[in-house]
């Protein structure tokens, strides 16, 4: 486990304030199970020992954040770097409102690619750049899930290499995306503002 790694996450909505504790305990139990799996030896069967060091204050703080009945994404993060065989690990938690982060067709990143004057490796690096920029924006916005690329990336690369002039390449949100994620990205190639093809 590395510092800041998400151990568990869940979308929660608590209608009755007294149900908040059960919801938080369930997410912490999932985090404990996941930590046991991640920190057990490769051939060993993961145990379900209490590896996550949880305090009553941490539980109270999370309950206070989510008990208003709105939708929240609750995330449990590793507070440090841990290796196999650790007996206890520290964590920190975050509860963020599940709200619209990116609208469908919103531009996330832009670059240019010119297969006439660039090697195929340079073209691929440009595409990876817009994907990385999209992932960065998603993480900064609090989206937990990994970015998913719509369609076939390799087909897009092949089509791009057949165009023998500079085109604009954009990463756009394929659909409305909320904090819970995932962010689905569509990669689009444009020439003079007109879409040529996309993933």
Task: Describe each region flagged by the PLM.
Residues 1-199:
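Membrane-proximal structural modules of membrane-associated proteins and complexes
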């Amino acid at each position: 486990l590395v510092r800041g790694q998400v151990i568990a996450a869940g979308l929660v909505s608590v209608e009755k304030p007294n149900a908040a504790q059960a919801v938080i305990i369930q997410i912490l139990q999932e985090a404990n199970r996941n930590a046991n799996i991640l920190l057990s030896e490769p051939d060993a069967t993961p145990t379900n020992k209490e590896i996550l060091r949880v305090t009553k204050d941490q539980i109270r703080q999370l309950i206070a954040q989510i008990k208003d009945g709105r939708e929240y994404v609750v995330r449990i993060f590793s507070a440090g770097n841990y290796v196999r065989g650790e007996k206890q690990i520290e964590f920190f938690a975050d509860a963020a409102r599940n709200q619209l982060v990116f609208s469908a067709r919103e531009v996330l990143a832009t670059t240019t690619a010119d297969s006439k004057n660039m090697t195929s490796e340079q073209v691929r690096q440009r595409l990876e750049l817009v994907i990385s920029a999209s992932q960065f924006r998603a993480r900064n916005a609090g989206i937990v899930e990994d970015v998913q690329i719509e369609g076939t990336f390799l087909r897009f690369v092949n089509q791009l290499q057949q165009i023998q002039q500079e085109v604009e390449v954009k990463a756009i949100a394929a659909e409305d995306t909320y904090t819970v994620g995932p962010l689905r990205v569509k990669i689009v190639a444009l020439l003079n503002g007109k879409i040529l093809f996309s993933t």
